[in-house]
Amino acid sequence: MKVLRDRETGTSRGAGRRPRRKREAKKTTLKKFRRRIPLYLSLTAMGSVLAGLIFTGALSVQGASLTDAIKDRFAFSGYLQSTYRQSVHKENPLAAIQRVGLETRFNQGSWIRGFASGYVDTDLSVTGRWHSREPVVTPEVGEAYLTIDTHYADLIVGMQQIRWGEADALSTFDLINPIDYRNPIATGRSTQRLSVGAADLRVSLKGLGLLDLICVPFPRFSRLAEYGSPWEDKGLRELRHYVGEGLVGRKYDNGPFEPEFAGRLKFFQSGYDLAFMFFKGYEHKPLYTAGIDYQNMSATIHETYKTFEAFGLSSAVSILKSTLRTEFTLRHNYPFQSDDIDIERRNDYEAIIGWDRMFLTNLNVNLQTFFSSYDGKKVRGKDRERYGATWSVSDKYLDDALTAGVRGEYFANNDDACVEVFGEYEYDDHLRFTAGYMFFSGGKSNDLGQYDKNDHFYFGVKYSF
């Protein structure tokens, strides 16, 4: 059984379950609060630092008001965005999201900078899914960090998106930021990611390259689709059903969790980049083992998180008008989820080769092939070899105001696929329109094939201010 983690247990609507549901709801709320303590602490500390900088900066401005000081040091912007996604197989929409987003940039002289972004989503489509436990309103922090800039090194502290992969779309080394499974599909060949609270030290190697050292003191784990969501994983839905019917119990791993560490040594010359990378941390989606609760004499599913190490090598080479990108990664002792509801460790080898080129004026072609394989005995439910391709082809029209194209990914080992036809029109510097069609294919139990009922059209408008 392929399962994922969630804190909200889906239960049947039969009689006699309500008291247990209330107790589990209280436990769930407490567990959610505990898991979010690192995020709350980091945001509180960051807010205190920003407030202190505003105060001290204002005092240092002679003959100027506090308002003038804030205007000199801060730049504010935001946007209003509306997105509608309608499945061609379902009556109810997949999403009808109204988003309000805000961003701010801060500068204190030349040595310290700050950036913060966040948004609030109101998804009106949730009201049409009567059995769903999705929230209608969802606030989210995008990124919020401070940068201390010196001549030889930069220190970046706060909530960040850290993407080290050289290859576009799929990457073997985007391991630091967990996938947001509440809405996992960003485009036809990329995933949504969550920011993490990290300290990132970047040391310049006198023009030869860069040394990047990262510590994530409180690991952040993937958020999963709520009960009844159109993006709810099939295995997760089954687990919730079994727990709700009282067929199995469920235990959670609430830590404490070890800090995560990563490092990158990158050399760059004209037309050539080479990087060596290291990661020691968690598989951010939950893993499950089955056992027996001898006190209650019942079957129990235990949710846990396991660590592993990864070593990688990446390069980017410019050849004529093209760029060739490669990534090779060893995920040492990686924890695979078995269909036997157990965790099996293997060494997993991954490789990506990508090529992109700009033809004519604006015709962009980006192709990628990937291959991965693990050693040892076969893990039940996991293909030993995974391979396929991703692509993106786009061009610009109407004086470069309209970008249109097609992008997607195909896993040849199991026929999983996601393809998106997309268009984006920039009316002016403030107003932007998007439209497209996305479809999925593959086996009903595959990662992408399970969403074949989510084939959909989408339309969006975004106004920036």
Show the residue positions of the predicted features.
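Outer-membrane beta-barrel "beta-signal"
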Residues: 181, 439, 452-465
